[in-house]
Amino acid sequence: MAMAAVNCLILVDLQAAFVSGPVAVPGATVLLAAATDLLARARQARSLIIHLQNDGAPGMEDEPGTSGWVLFVEPGAGETVIRKTTDDGFDGTNLGDILAAGRIRRLAVTGVMSEMCVSATARSALHRGLAVVLPHDAHATYDIPAVPGIAPAIPAAMVARVAEWALGDQLELPVTGRDVQFTAAPYGDLGEVSAKPA
């Protein structure tokens, strides 16, 4: 049975440091291919598009104003950029208000990190009664290093798989982003918004 279309795409922390250069996540190439395809089709369908941008602490790769903090994919006209300081894109931001104003009930999520910001944002959306689609190839993270006496190193792909599994049965989990279909946001173009954390 075909999956119902979504009318919103949330791109989580697709910032330069995490998807390009020496500290990019191991699965950056696959992630970017999936994310850019999702974005292109969401734009074509006139879905609501929201870019989350994390404001890291001083000295971190995503510290505001640094090259690593910049969004890797430039937002288009009419797309929303929401800056945040915690894993959950809803926490201290107007993301929930924007989704409500746009009458969004089904959304797709892509980005990093699988077990942190992607998971936290997807879980909050589910708790708000929204249908969430998270393509398996459209999120990524880092390896977890070994800790003597606790566990060996855990590969990033396994971390990502556990993260999506932990979101439970309500999550819709297509194998690839190509399985996701988009439709226009019912409330139309909300206009470009750039919001800093509250």
Residue positions per predicted region:
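Short acidic, Gly/Ser-rich segments with clustered Asp/Glu that frequently serve as metal-coordination loops
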Residues: 17-21
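A short alpha/beta connector and helix-capping loop motif
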Residues: 23-50, 54
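Short, well-ordered beta-to-alpha junction loops that form the rim of enzyme active sites
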Residues: 54-55, 112
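N-terminal nucleotide-binding beta1-loop-alpha1 segment
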Residues: 10-14
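Active-site-adjacent betaalpha module
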Residues: 2-8, 36-37, 60-198
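Short, solvent-exposed loop/turn segments at secondary-structure boundaries
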Residues: 22-26, 61-64
